[in-house]
């Protein structure tokens, strides 16, 4: 039986932690930043975490991560 392919788009956006959860970056920080508050932009720099409902989908997209 052939190996399962890794979804390369997802592999570039998510990292798996030692506990098996996924971390990712936040959206909304690439352009149109002048109208966003400094506090909001600062909080968007922090790492986000994937919710449990979506982690199952990532497990299928990233079988070897």
From Swiss-Prot:
It comes from the Bacteria. The keyword Amino-acid biosynthesis does not apply. GO terms for biological process: translation. GO terms for molecular function: structural constituent of ribosome. One of its GO terms (cellular component) is cytosolic large ribosomal subunit. The keyword Ribonucleoprotein applies. Keywords: Ribonucleoprotein, Ribosomal protein. Gene3D superfamilies: 4.10.410.60. NCBIfam families: rpmI_bact (TIGR00001). Belongs to the bacterial ribosomal protein bL35 family. This is Large ribosomal subunit protein bL35. It comes from Stenotrophomonas maltophilia (strain R551-3).
